[in-house]
Amino acid sequence: MERASVGTLLISVAFLAMLACSIALVSGLFGTLHPAFDSFSHFRVHLAVLMALCALPLLATTFRLQAAVALHFAVAAFATTSGSLSFSRLWPVQAAYEAKNEDRAIYKLLQMNLRYDNPTPKKVLSLIGRTNPDVITLDEVSAMWATALGYISSAYPYRILCPYPNGIFGVALLSRRPFAAGTEARCERRGAMATATVDFGGIEVDVAAIHLSWPWPREQYWQIGELTEPLSALGETAIMAGDCNAAPWSAAVRRVAALGGLTVMPSAGPTWIHIKLPDFLRRFAGLPIDQVFSKGGVTIHSATRLEDTGSDHLPVMVEFSLRLNQQKPLDEHETATAAISQTGKTPG
């Protein structure tokens, strides 16, 4: 009798959990109606998996019909994220990135949320030195980081740091390549976005770093509205990266992309999890909230999550090329990270 009561209780708990997950999933699909709904969308993958796990044992109970419907819904909800996550590359028809063109230079952008109180800044500086990116977009640039980044000023002399009012969530943009002549790097008034026009050997590209606040009930929705002007001011060819605190399929990220006339890059995978949890769990069950956007002549070729550097976010390395009519002029001082495939003999 007691065993039957326990079984009934477990079935009831599983059914209620399945129902709660379904309500949250449905709410997340209506993120454009209100930011409160969009807050559920960031957990769509987790909710879909949890609902499926709750539904499976219910298939052997009187709730089998409801469980079957829930399983189908979980699969459908999960499928809505497949075009945004890296596992979509398992299917050739959904290949996420374009193949490299041997006639174009390949550049590297490193996106990092540094974490304002990172106890291991040397790991960050070491990673930058080893990977040698052309441009770097940084989030959570606190006063501590403003000092630490000074150690690589000779390697990255072109830079702009934009402080946030709380002194913690600022952004920064560092470049090995010069900012375009006659242009000026600029900060959004509250330090949530930094923009500079970078000269890639004669081709000018707007590069931006962005850091959004947390979703509703925090200020993310209103903050995106405040960023309308700098986003819409991005040039015809641009690349932007940052911690959006939002999943790539969310209404928030789609809104950012629409304001800037940008395309969201398929995610490299989960990049964030609570700082106390292990790295292997972050790579498997974290949230994919570090995004890269592009438009115009920028072609994205790859995106890779790098090793842990003491932050609650993983760094993301992006390889891209410029798809313009005029290829950049030959330059004997071409940066080491721009790999140009040459045929014939080298200049003498």
Residue ranges and their predicted role:
Residues 11-12, 19, 100, 146, ...:
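Short, flexible segments with low predicted structural confidence
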Residues 60-61, 68-130:
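N-terminal signal-anchor transmembrane helix
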Residues 51, 57-85, 182, 188-206:
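Glycine/proline-rich, flexible active-site/cofactor-binding loop segments
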Residues 11-59:
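Membrane-embedded alpha-helical segments of integral membrane proteins
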